[in-house]
Amino acid sequence: PSSEIKELVSSIEFKDDAKKVFFASNPQIENKDSFASKCINRAEKTAVLGCYKDSEIHVLDVKDPQLNGIKEVTAAHEFLHAIWARMDDNTRKDLGKKLTEEYERIKTPKFEELMKNYKETEPEEIENELHSLIGTQEVEISADLEKHYAKFFNNRKKIANFYKQYNSKFTKLENEIENLNNQLPNLKKEIDDKTAQYNSQLEQLDKDILNFNQRANNGSFNSQQQFDRERHQLALRKNKIDSYNKEINESIDRFNVMRQRLLDISIQNEKLYDSITTNLKTSNKI
């Protein structure tokens, strides 16, 4: 095995017998072109990070340091497919029941969406996929399943925590993108509404100032007190409108900052997905 494979094995912490199965599966860490030629053979809806094909394990060589641990999780996931392939039907049936029960207990909308994709593309492999997904992505699982996975890994939770760490990078960016996409249209509408109101108030103020000046020039005021009073009222309105304009400009500045942030993190998100994607840039799947 290559030095990189040996490092991967050391990091995953296989049990001795499991290590033999892993090496027997001829594990390979491959660049995008090589990986795609072996693992991408249909229209995928998710990013494929690894595959177990023709009794061999293939892992995409993801180099982004933000995603440290992703190769370990992928290799462990595909290794569990190799284990599943070696099980007899009775063992699979018994384990499949436990896996399905565990899935029903721990499923999230995102997990359900992932399994829906598997049901569309590989309906006969649902329990096989649950075996790999639960074993490598869920930190807390049933005692029965933990005992099962303990046959292969010295520290299964370490692998699940690798997944949790790198997946949080995607989740954090996606949540912020979603929040900004929700906030920006509302803020824009608020700015547009306030701007329309400001323009209307300013137009009326300009008319009233023009009228005031005409009356002053024509000597239409009955007293200095009336002149001063109306002039003071116009000044108060102008100050209020100026404050309103300042508030609008502050909202515009906030909008521009948020829009730039959305652009920046969208680029970050795109780069992250590009590092794990050989076909489509969507949610990650292993």
Region spans (language model):
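Short, charged, amphipathic alpha-helical segments
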Residues: 97, 225-232
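C-terminal amphipathic alpha-helix
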Residues: 237-286
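Glycine-rich, often proline-containing surface loops adjacent to acidic residues and nearby aromatics
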Residues: 55-58, 80
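Active-site recognition of the HExxH zinc-binding catalytic motif
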Residues: 73-85
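Metalloprotease/metallohydrolase-associated module, dominated by Zn2+-dependent proteases
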Residues: 2-54, 92-203, 213, 234, ...
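Short pre-active-site segment immediately N-terminal to the catalytic Zn-binding motif
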Residues: 58-74
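Extended alpha-helical coiled-coil "stalk/arm" regions
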Residues: 194-228
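Short, solvent-exposed loop/turn and secondary-structure capping segments
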Residues: 85-87, 95
